[in-house]
Structure formats: structure tokens, C-alpha cells
């Protein structure tokens, strides 16, 4: 007679244990924001499953390294860019386009902090951030070193070195652009709300990661985040070929057209927009931008219609670096004879005394 109540009690206990296990799994899930803070060398939330990992000497070294690097960058560059933008960008559009960006949200935000939608694009794959609580034993230290190495050139020189990035962003546990986007979002004071894989079909429509986007899908990621003001913002990154043949076979520019007009940033772009096989993207930027901020690796001055654009040059035009011979622009040199001073460096000539920046504003 007593066996029945005991059986019921055992069953009830089993159900409670299962429920507790499920609750534990839900509680133990690492949020995207905590993962971003951890990768950025910033403490995650107190209740995060990642908090115990911050006691690892490898993470503590990572924290000190990035604190110093971003502290120097803020003092030397990003705070000055933000001050420049506050003075010179009177009425920024809600959308900003940053072609050939790689994962460089850092400078997208520095120049256009008031944007509500950021669209970044480059060849580099989206990648992923693995479950940081389930990394193989001994892989945390080399993984964090990979992140530091991937950030090295942009923290020192303001741009990613493309060939080096191809290697760094495919190495180790943290592959692709997403881990670096996480770092820049966290270090820019953003709070990540949601991260989801997306694809574009050939009409430019956005599909969630598991939906069929047709024959020529463009892979990407959509990140919803909030700034210090609490306002919701969206960052898109798409891995796509921006050459004429590439954009002809994708819906990327059609997607961008739905968000146009916007503001554009072009820097350290390997002078690709000087070439004929990137004319489609060049023409799109000119047609769909209210303002363009660029160094001389962007759109050649000869491709701007002077009846439609006003030019505001800053800094000093010293010509292209030796790696890009034949890209000197006499018209650029003439324009920059009347330039305004600039107290930060940008682009391939990253020292402030030899950097150039052109603000082009479309005539209403």
C-alpha cells in the first residue's frame, strides 16, 4: 500500500529534477552581450556563466592588453573623430553604408554615431562565436591571442590589412568577422540585444538563417543593439563580392537601395573604386549617398559631378603609398591646397600630419 505513494513521489522528484535541469540550461545560456564583453576584455554580467572564466590568467592578460590598446586609440583617434563629426556632420541620415569595411564597426560608429542602421560589407566571411563555456581545454589562451592579432593593424594604423585578415579571421576558435564585430560593439559602449544570421535573395529581401533565399544568397548577420541613450539600432554585415560581376549576381545593392539615401564611409579601400570593374558600386554610392566621407583610396575626384557635390577637404594629401602606384590624383592635390586642419590620422597614411579626409556633401 505504501509503494504507490513512494512511486508517485519518485516520479514527482524526477519531473522536478528535469525541470530544474531545463531551467539551469536556460540560466546558463551565454548572452551575446556577455560574449561580446568577454571577447572585448570587459567583465560580463555578474550572473553570466562566463564570469568564472575571467579568473583565467589568459583572459586577465587579454583584459589588460585591450584596455591599454583601446585607451590609447580613444585618446589618439576615436574621440577626435567624434568631435570632428559633431562639428562637420550637421544632419546625418539614419542609414550609413560602409563598403569594403571588413568588421570595422569601430570607425563606422566614430564617424556616424547617430545612425540607426549600419550596413557593412566585404569579402570576409561572417563566421561565428562559439559557446565560450564549451571551448576545448587549453584553447582559450590561443583563441584570445587570435583576437588580439586580428585587431592589431586596425588598432595601430586605423585599417585592416586584407591579406593578414584573411588568415587571422580563419584561424582558431573565433573565425570570421563576427568576433571582431562583438569586440567593437562592446568597446563602443553598445549593448547587444539580439544576433541572427540572415541571407539576401536576388531581390534584396532579407531572410532568416534557415529560410531559402534562392540560387544566389548573400550571407550576413543582423545585430540589434542599443547605445548609451538606450535607442535601438541595427547593424548588418554581409559577406559579398563588390565587383561588377559580384553585385550583378546578388541582391546586396537592391537591399541597400531600400535603405537609401544614406551616408557613406570609404577608407583604406585598396583604390578598388578607381578600377572599372567596381564601377557599379561606385555609381551606387554616388547616387545613394547624402554625404561621403573618404580618404583618397575612395571614389576618384573626377567621378564626382561638381554641380551636385560640395567638397570639404581636411588634412594633407601626400599621394598614395608605394603599394598603390599610379593612383596619384593631381585634382585631389589641387583641392587639398585649400584644406582645413585635422588632428587625427586615418587611412593608409595613418599619421595625422600626412592623412587626408574628404567630406563630400550632395547639393539638395
What are these regions (language model features)?
Residues 1-11:
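Bacterial N-terminal signal peptides that target proteins for export
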Residues 169, 194-237:
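Short aromatic loop motif centered on NTY/YTY
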Residues 89-90, 178-190, 212-213:
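Short, surface-exposed basic-aromatic patches at helix termini and helix-loop junctions that form
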Residues 22-26:
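Sec/Tat signal peptide C-region and signal peptidase I cleavage site
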Residues 101-112, 157-179:
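Short, thiol/selenol-centered motifs that function as redox-active sites or metal-ligating centers
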Residues 10-19:
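Bacterial N-terminal signal peptides
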Residues 27-153, 233-364:
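Non-globular targeting/processing and membrane-anchoring segments
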Residues 121-125, 186-194:
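Conserved helix-turn-beta segment immediately C-terminal to the redox Cys motif
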